[in-house]
């Protein structure tokens, strides 16, 4: 039995800047964020990935839950999560920080550097300078490891962010979140259902330091070491997919299962021995 909520009388939140693939329907209601699927099965990705991260050394991440959303006489599969931002806090993206401090887009800033390692080093130094946060290299490396494993194609400079305390001016890290465009979720445009999964994986372009996931991942790990340790099994993958089986067709469930099994085999070094 699926969970359902009617948001027809609620106001939409503008999300144009936070995704490279259009404006996803999004609401903030009663201290919870609701997101409707826009390109394919984003909600499934958020839920399943957060379930799997429970079996890892990653402690600070957003936990998502599946939901059917009624809005404007239509029904959407999607997900919801608790709002991790307090009333006196704002989300500040890397792109916003760059425009504020450098008067330039950070995506353009990165064009000054050819090697991914130099791009990552520059990014870490800039973030630490303006936010005063420590261990930014470890934080970004873990993000790149998770993005590579889960094939997240949407980690651009408007989708890397920090939490600002509006009263004190102090920053803290965002929990790891926003994995919606992972696991070939975009079935509407780039990764149609019915096509060979492994050929589609080869088409994915990573962000923001290189188009290849492993190239930017290797560069970050050379600088800051490997950060993420996973411990979920194939049975844990099956359990996570069972949690969303009432919301998505069987062919989507099986496609994601195949992808996760393959990624688990490829990135064995990330798993706890």
Residue map of PLM features:
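ATP-dependent phospho-/nucleotidyl transfer catalytic cores
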Residues: 84-144, 247, 251, 266-268
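Short alpha-helical "patches" and their helix-cap loops
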Residues: 63-72, 156-166, 273
């Amino acid at each position: 039995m699926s969970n359902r909520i009617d948001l027809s009388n609620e106001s939409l939140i503008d999300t144009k800047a936070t995704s490279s693939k259009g404006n996803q329907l999004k609401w903030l209601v009663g201290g919870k964020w609701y997101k409707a699927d826009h390109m394919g099965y984003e909600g499934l990705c958020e839920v399943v990935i957060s379930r799997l991260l429970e079996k890892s050394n990653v402690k600070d991440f957003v936990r998502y839950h599946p939901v059917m959303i009624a809005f404007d006489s239509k029904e959407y599969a999607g997900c919801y999560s608790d709002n991790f931002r307090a009333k006196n806090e704002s989300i500040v993206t890397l792109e916003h920080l760059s425009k504020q401090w450098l008067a330039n887009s950070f995506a353009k800033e990165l064009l000054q550097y050819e090697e991914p390692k130099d791009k990552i080093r520059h990014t870490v130094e800039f973030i630490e300078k303006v936010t005063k946060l420590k261990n930014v290299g470890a934080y970004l490396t873990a993000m790149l490891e998770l993005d590579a494993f889960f094939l997240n194609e949407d980690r651009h400079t408007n989708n890397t962010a920090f939490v600002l305390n509006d009263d004190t001016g102090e920053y803290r890290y965002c929990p790891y979140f926003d994995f919606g465009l992972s696991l070939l979720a975009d079935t509407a445009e780039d990764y149609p259902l019915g096509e060979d999964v492994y050929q589609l994986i080869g088409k994915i372009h990573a962000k923001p330091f290189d188009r290849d996931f492993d190239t930017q991942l290797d560069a970050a790990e050379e600088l800051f070491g490997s950060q993420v340790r996973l411990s979920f099994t194939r049975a844990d993958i099956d359990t996570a997919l069972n949690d969303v089986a009432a919301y998505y067709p069987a062919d989507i469930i099986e496609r994601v299962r195949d992808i996760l099994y393959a990624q688990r085999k490829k990135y064995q070094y990330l798993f706890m021995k």
